[in-house]
């Protein structure tokens, strides 16, 4: 962002916050954050699970609004987006940990490593529920 008076930069923003993107990225990221009641900071990985009830409720509401403009091709990749986003964020947290925690703010030295583990565990939980998740998506 540029200050109108000084012409100097005042802040950096992610472009995905100001421009349209792939529907799958928004859909997958919404489910990634909504369907992990344990949150990103959980240290007990046994508590990290993909909550199918929350996913079903979100998907029903989402499809009421978005179902009319989603193509068959869009629908075919919805499960993949749910699986991809925690994996991708896990990679980003892990990369940041290896780089010295330069992108994601941390208050503890291994916080991004733990965040990566949480996301990878969430991805595993999604994979374990693939058949059920696909069934829900198919019915919508």
Question: Residue locations for each model-derived region?
Answer:
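Active-site acidic catalytic loop and adjacent metal/ATP-binding pocket
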Residues: 1-25
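Short, conserved loop/turn and helix-capping segments at secondary-structure boundaries
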Residues: 17, 21, 52, 110-113, ...
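Transmembrane helix-bundle signature of multi-pass membrane transporters/permeases
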Residues: 19, 81-85
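Active-site activation/catalytic loop segments of kinase-like enzymes and analogous catalytic loops
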Residues: 24-68, 84-103
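All-alpha amphipathic helical-bundle segments outside canonical DNA-binding/catalytic cores
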Residues: 70-82
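ATP/Mg2+ or Mg2+-diphosphate-binding catalytic cores
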Residues: 88-140
């Amino acid at each position: 962002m540029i200050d109108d008076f000084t012409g100097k930069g005042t802040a950096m923003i992610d472009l995905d916050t100001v421009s349209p993107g792939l529907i799958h990225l928004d859909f997958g990221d919404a489910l990634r954050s909504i369907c992990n009641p344990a949150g990103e900071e959980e240290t007990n990985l046994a508590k990290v699970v993909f909550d199918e009830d929350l996913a079903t409720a979100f998907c029903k509401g989402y499809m009421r609004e978005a179902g009319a403009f989603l193509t068959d091709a869009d629908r075919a990749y919805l499960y993949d987006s749910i699986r991809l986003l925690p994996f991708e964020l896990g990679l980003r947290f892990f990369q940041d940990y290896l780089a010295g925690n330069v992108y994601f703010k941390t208050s503890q030295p291994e916080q991004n490593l733990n965040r990566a583990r949480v996301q990878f565990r969430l991805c595993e939980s999604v994979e374990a529920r693939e058949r059920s998740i696909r069934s829900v998506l198919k019915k919508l």
